[in-house]
């Protein structure tokens, strides 16, 4: 029982009861393995301990990469990523609930030649850096000219001549 007196709060001694906590793996980090699977001609990658019952919003990456040619097979032990057929010609997605996945998705789409329009990206301009500008600045060096607005980023699928020896910063 807690006791208060003027500007003092007294809390009686108690016993510490340690408990085990299971910290689930990071789905944001898993997004890069999805990207590798999407870019590879063939892929089968196992990521242990990832669950489709995750509390993390970025677990949506499994569904977001399906149209990019990566299927997710869940088991008790984790998830197996497999290369599958890409079936879309334009990728449109609202990423307002998972804006941190935009960088991985944008680069993947460019490298596989898939035009896209991602919306819900307004928070990316106020992260540790302006991530929208960073994507534009680095991908133009590889020949991908991205078009941005306050809330979206898109690429029409057209490439320009990249720098002869681009320096990615």
Predicted regions and their residues:
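Short, structured segments at the rim of ligand-binding sites
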Residues: 1-169
